[in-house]
UniProtKB/Swiss-Prot annotation:
Protein name: Origin of replication complex subunit 4
Transmembrane helix keyword on record: no
Annotated residues for binding of ATP: G63, P64, R65, G66, C67, G68, K69, A70
Organism from which the protein derives: Oryza sativa subsp. japonica
Keywords of this entry: ATP-binding, DNA replication, DNA-binding, Nucleotide-binding, Nucleus
Lineage: Eukaryota, Viridiplantae, Streptophyta, Embryophyta, Tracheophyta
Family: Belongs to the ORC4 family.
UniProt KW Magnesium keyword: no
A GO molecular-function descriptor: DNA replication origin binding
Amino acid sequence: MAAAAAAASVASQAQAVLRGRLCDQAVVHSALRSSPDTNYSKLKYLVASSVSEACNNSVLLLGPRGCGKAAVRFSFLVYSSAPLSAVFSDAGVVFDEMCQWAIYDFTLWVVSAWTEVVDMVLDDLKKDHPDAISVIRLNGMLHSDDNCATKEIARQLCLEHQLSFSKMASSDDNTEFMIDMLRECGLAHKTIIFVLEEFDLFAQGKQRLLYSLLDAMQSLTSQAVVIGVSCRLDADQLLEKRVRSRFSHRKLLFVPSSVDSLQRLMEHLLALPEDSPLPTKYVREYNARITSIFNDKKFKGILSSLTDADATTSHILRFLFRVVSYMDIDSGLLSMQSFMNALSSMQRQPKMDSLQDLSILELYILVCMNRLEDKEKSSYNFITIMKEYKSVQDAYKTSDKYSHTVCFRAFEHLLDRELISFADNKGRNQALEYRPVKLLISSRELAESLKLNTTCPAVLQKLLDRERYM
């Protein structure tokens, strides 16, 4: 009994350590700081040189959502020096070392919603130049209106420099105040860094804010850096000629993480450090087990299934947190079953259940749509699907032939079940047959449903497998 209690105690301590690592952005993003080729290093060099050399600069961070444009941002700016318990107590959440699910959900909100590379850079620079940096943050979803944006800039500048803010000031007054502050901060050798989230939304309308800001930065007395963050790769092309001429045209492109890099991240996060308070023998045994799991072919399949739907860092963190929760308390070690259980708990079961109730014809329609997407058809509708269905019938000489009317009813049923949807809101006055549609399930989900469906014709499984492995 005593030995079992001791093992359970060690397992609980290990879970607490691992959860702490998953909740600590310094640990999550430490790999970014170690390599000189990362966007983090490039952005830090750019901003640091602007601060030290007292010059103006501008840069765009472009890439799809969830690929880390903003990690190279919040991780440390606000909460880096505070212990995790302090973060949650400030938010009105009681921190428990065993970490309840509700607390974890809040942690991930902090990790992903405040986002991630800019904050890391700003935190490092604030440590190096504590009195030489002032940060102003705007979001295009909230401040795309020029009047609202200049007012928010004035408010943040007043708050940063302990000045009184006038809510009644006009837009022109706020713009003039911003220009004056840029000049005064430049004379005081202090850099103002403007972080513009959803930058493409600022590049609409007359773009008066961007013009005023970039034009003021042309002055020798000003000292500022503009960092634009956008998921649109053509964000710089949206700028007017007068604005574009004042922009530096520096761009850092972010791409989604590869499967190999995600596996390295998982290995890094799940490995117990040698200097942890846990017994050395246990740490070595645990780390050896983790290495063995990651080298297993089954794990490759789990990772592939996980990243098919979502390959973002926040999704990986949610998965790993569940893996830790499925740790075997008796042995205190993770197993392949821990990863499989975590994956099962994250997969969208309602859609899988819906797929089990479909008719043979509806499965044919889904497989035909999947084939069209694999052929990289940019747009297709019911008529296109029927042509694909006919080509399948002609190629395989199957007996599963249905009339156009019956097929259309099955198509409407799939729309009602929300397994497929219209590609856009255009053409609402068009007949349903001609409106573009898209699949709302992945090829892996479709393949799993075909395997579980006992009435599914073998030809459908062949068709899907052929497309997946071509």
